[in-house]
Design a protein with these regions (language model features):
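General beta-strand structural signal in soluble alpha/beta enzymes
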Residues: 6-8, 30-31, 71-74, 96, ...
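N-terminal glycine-rich phosphate/adenylate-binding segment common to multiple enzyme folds
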Residues: 56-121
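Short glycine-rich anion-binding loops that position phosphate/pyrophosphate groups of nucleotides
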Residues: 10, 76-79, 169, 201-202
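Short coil/turn connectors at secondary-structure junctions
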Residues: 1-3, 24-27, 45, 66-69, ...
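N-terminal basic/disordered segments at the start of proteins
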Residues: 2-33
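Alpha-helical structural signal in soluble globular domains
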Residues: 20, 102, 106, 110, ...
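Conserved mixed alpha/beta catalytic, RNA-binding, or beta-rich assembly cores of soluble enzyme
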Residues: 21, 35, 93-97, 110-218
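Feature captures the catalytic cores and cofactor-binding loops of soluble hydro-lyases/lyases
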Residues: 33-68, 82, 86-91, 181-258
Length: 258
């Protein structure tokens, strides 16, 4: 039986990966991050240990003890913890990608290859075009094009993946707070009918921090009465896709792959 190491952050992504991998005959050993990972993951995997997000050596020791040679990252760690946790010492101006590169290098040194985060879920990547019942209006399409350009630039500067726009005005750009709070912030300015655009980095490494949307994203969009969510086709993962689409259609949201 093949073994998979799972580095599990927050949200449903790690649970979906674990279930899918188990369904394909893998034995899954998960490294769960305190304060982030859903505790119910323990029921979905064969072995699990809890670590603080800065305890890289503990993660490596666990994978070595489990005989892991391939691993996958799923779910995020809230970025504000990098600054709030007193035990974490970061070099100035360090980027997400630099931190993750350290993890990749450390895994490689113990013989563990890091797979793409979408390895088991490639069929759930967003396709190009409208995949909701309601298509965007001409005005919404203008905002999608505008938001796409802004989001691509923001992602290239490691600022964030998501922007909120309305009538050609930028209402919010995702920063440290994450996607949900950025949507809420933009929605508070634009009120009903904002357009949300989520893009990958220009040279997105699919092993980590891939754009993800799920039912929780739709809940937040409904909360602020957004009208459109546009995501990068081929790079954005749709978690619990059927439930996500049903919720979007119920709310009259337009979902578009660009």
């Amino acid at each position: 039986m093949e073994r998979l190491g799972l580095i599990a952050g927050n949200g449903q992504f790690p649970l979906v990966v674990a279930r899918t991998a188990k369904g394909r005959g893998y034995s899954v050993a998960a490294c769960a991050i305190r304060g982030e990972t859903d505790p119910s993951l323990e029921k979905e995997v064969d072995a699990l240990t809890w670590v603080e997000f800065w305890e890289l050596e503990k993660l490596l020791d666990f994978f070595k003890s489990q005989g892991i040679h391939q691993a996958l990252m799923a779910g995020q760690v809230r970025k504000e913890r990098l600054f709030k946790e007193s035990r974490v010492q970061l070099p100035s101006r360090v980027a997400d990608q630099a931190l993750l590169a350290i993890v990749v290098k450390s895994l490689k040194e113990i013989g563990v290859r890091l797979l793409d985060s979408t390895y088991f879920l490639s069929s759930d990547l967003a396709q190009k075009g409208c995949f909701s019942k309601r298509a965007p209006t001409p005005e919404e399409r203008k905002d999608i094009a505008f938001g796409r350009d802004v989001a691509k630039r923001a992602a290239s500067f490691e600022i964030g993946q998501t922007v909120v726009v309305k009538q050609g005005v930028v209402l919010a750009i995702e920063a440290l707070e994450g996607t949900d709070q950025a949507i809420r912030r933009g929605g508070s300015f634009g009120r009903e009918g904002v357009v949300v655009v989520k893009m990958a980095r220009p040279r997105q490494d699919m092993r980590f921090d891939v754009p993800v949307i799920g039912p929780r994203t739709i809940e937040v969009l409904r909360e602020v009465r957004a009208s459109v969510l546009a995501v990068q086709a081929g790079k954005t993962l749709l978690i619990e896709k059927n439930r996500l689409l049903a919720s979007a259609d119920e709310a009259g949201l337009s979902l578009v792959g660009i």
